[in-house]
Amino acid sequence: MSFKREGDDQSQLNILKKRRVSDLLSNFIPDDEATLMKNGRYSCLVCSHRPVFDTVDMLVVHRKGKRHLEGMKWFYGKKNQLRREIDKRRHQDYVKAEDDRQEPSSSAPLLTQTRKITHHALLRTVPYSSCHKKASERSESSSKEHRNDLANSHLSMRTESNDSRTTVHQGPSEVKGEAKKKKKGASTLSSSVCEPLTEQRRRELDHYLKLKSSGWLQDRSGKWVKDENVEFDSDEEEPTLLPPCSESS
C-alpha cells in the first residue's frame, strides 16, 4: 500500500523523499533504471512505456518480470551502442588533433617557405627536383659562365701586367728563359702588332681598366656592353677603341 501524506509541510515531504531514496538504495536499483517522481512514486526507466509504482516492493516485483528483462536487453544494448559511438568520436577527434600538430600550419605559408629555404641553404648539395624547369637551369648556367669569363679575363690581364713589369727589370737571357717556361701558359698578343711588346700590354691593361671603371661590361663573345646600373654622360652605344700604337723609329 502507498504512503499518503497529509498537509503541505515541506519537512515531511523531505523526510518522505529521503526514505524512498533509501529504499531504492537498499534494493540495489541503479539510478538510471528507476527514478523518484515528484508525487513520491517510482517510475521504471528501462521499459519503454514508463510504468509507475507506489512502493519499492512493487517496483522490485516488476523488475523480475519477463517484459522488464526483455526491456533491459534493449536498454543496455542502446546504452552500449551510444558509449561506443562516443568513444569513436573521441578517438577521431584525438587522431585529427595529432595530425594537425604534425602537419605545418597552412595559416603561415611565409614561415613554411622560410624554413624550406633555410633547410636547402644548409645542404651541401642541391637536392634533385623533378619539377625544376630546364629554361631556368640554362639561364642560371649562362649567368654563371658569364661571371666566370669576366673573372678569368680580368685575372689574365692582371697576370699579363705582372709579367710585363718583371720583364722590364730582367735581362735578355732571363726574358728568353721565362718565355720558354711559360710557353704553355696564358695566351699572349702577337708581337707583330707594335713594338715594344711590354708597352702594348700595358696600354691594353690601362684601356681595359678604364672601360671597367666607366661602367662597361664584356660579354661572353668579347663585346663591350653598358652596365644597367651605371649612368653614362653620353649616349654612345660603343666604347672608345684602343688607339693603335705608334711605330717606333
From Swiss-Prot:
Biological process terms in GO annotation: alternative mRNA splicing, via spliceosome; RNA splicing
Under what name is this protein listed? Sodium channel modifier 1
Q: What is its main location?
A: nucleus
InterPro entries in alphabetical order = SCNM1, SCNM1_acidic, Znf-SCNM1
Q: What Gene Ontology cellular-component terms does the record carry?
A: nuclear speck; nucleus; spliceosomal complex
Q: Has keyword Zinc? A: yes
Report the Pfam families cross-referenced here: SCNM1_acidic (PF15805), zf-SCNM1 (PF15803)
Where composition is biased (Polar residues), the residues are 104-115, 150-170
**Which ranges are annotated Acidic residues under compositional bias?**
230-239
What positions does the record give for the motif labelled Bipartite nuclear localization signal? 4-20
Query: Where are the Matrin-type-classified zinc fingers?
Result: 42-74
Q: According to the lineage, what is the superkingdom?
A: Eukaryota
Q: Which PANTHER family match?
A: SODIUM CHANNEL MODIFIER 1
What is the annotated quaternary arrangement, including any partners? Component of the minor spliceosome, which splices U12-type introns.
Task of the protein: As a component of the minor spliceosome, involved in the splicing of U12-type introns in pre-mRNAs.
Q: Does the keyword Zinc apply?
A: yes
Ordered alphabetically, the record's keywords are: Metal-binding, mRNA processing, mRNA splicing, Nucleus, Spliceosome, Zinc, Zinc-finger
Q: Where is this region: Disordered?
A: 94-116, 128-199, 228-249
Species assigned in the record: Danio rerio
Q: Where in the cell is it found?
A: Nucleus, Nucleoplasm; Nucleus speckle
Spans of biased composition, class Basic and acidic residues?
94-103, 134-149
GO molecular function term, any single one: zinc ion binding
